[in-house]
Amino acid sequence: MSIYDEKKEKVITMTVTLILVVILICIKVTHFVIIERPLKQCRIVSAYHLTVDTNGAQIDHSWLFEKDDLTYIDIAKTFEQTYFVTDYAGGSGDSGALNELTIAFGETMDGMPDIRITVSENGYIQINGKRAYPLSLKYAGNRLYGHLLECLQDGADRQQ
């Protein structure tokens, strides 16, 4: 084997090693940025308050934030601070009406939200999304509902 062949083999080995290292770094960065990104770094792309009757028919649907008018809020505050909101004075006068709050966090390349959290005042919590974030919900459903609503309204007031 000549010196030229040894150098060529060494160059090929180094090139393959370098390519593998770059691929591994890209995978790790993608994993951290896309999958392990903390919830508090996501932006709220939309949030709306929905009131439905006992049959599930929509009574009132009011946007807290429109997609064209994004509001940035420290999401960690939503889950870490306690607002003792026991009732939300709104919606319809129907005694069987159920208030529901949906918040969409983040945004994927196709424009869909990363994750949606829907909290009803009866305590029902639904989490949907393309990625599963490690959420720790510290509150009962109705307290979390009022708490999220208060934080969103507080954020809207601060934006104006």
Regions found by a protein language model. Name each.
Residues 2-160:
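Function-determining sites in protein domains
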